[in-house]
Amino acid sequence: RNMTAVRCGKEIVIFDMGLRLDQLMIHEDAEVDEMHSLDLIKIKAIPDDTVLQKVEGTVKAIVCSHGHLDHIGAIPKLAHRYKAPIIATPYATELIRQQISGEKKFGVNNRLFALSAGQRYTLSPNLVLEFVHTQHSIIDTVTPVLHTPHGAIVYACDFKFDRTPVIGKPPDFARFRQIGKEGVLALIVESTYIHRPGRCPSERIARDLVRDVITSFEDDKSAIVVSTFSSHISRVKTIAECAHEIGRKPVFLGRSMQKYSVTAEQMKFV
């Protein structure tokens, strides 16, 4: 349930509004689309943004770094409280649009604005938002950078320094270095398993491992069942390609698998 508010003077920028899925799993009868935000806050499924009532300032934007539910899942429940646009990458924006369309409790009329990696958006005379391209286990992920008169605030929440990705380009290391030289006021950083020493191998290595396993069943006549995160389009792409290599027809099952894959295909990511 990621959500971070940054205040500069009397202007506030909110980064992410996430949904904590494991808390919902505890409450099996929870129908998120029909639940009130206060009830979701009570079970710690979404951020408790009531703390912002004590913070003086105007929210200028709600910025999302990527389309995972733990970063956008609370938007249908909380965004309507703020007279501010929702800014995200094109793929994340479309996922947010779908989230909002399924909401049954609140009406969300915030303007949705798609900002691509490498672009900037002026929020006010003192605040400029920049999206820097990075990699993650979901396509079209960026590191938002908020440029202020006091220096840059880098919101690096979920990223992977993958130099050989399966989809898209490597992270924009040149721009990251340049921002560092220009001066960073604050780095807000988080990444899954960051407490473990070492590094995460490239997705290209994962692709080779998946191919090795799937192609080993080339002469088998039985059905092959493969599970993966539905939002991991690079992995889904690899699985589908490997299926074709051994003369099999890939069949996607599940609403989430359909949502993420169809959206990626329609937007020409695959």
Tell where the protein language model's regions lie, with residue ranges.
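His/Asp/Glu-rich metal-coordinating catalytic cores
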Residues: 1-61, 68-270
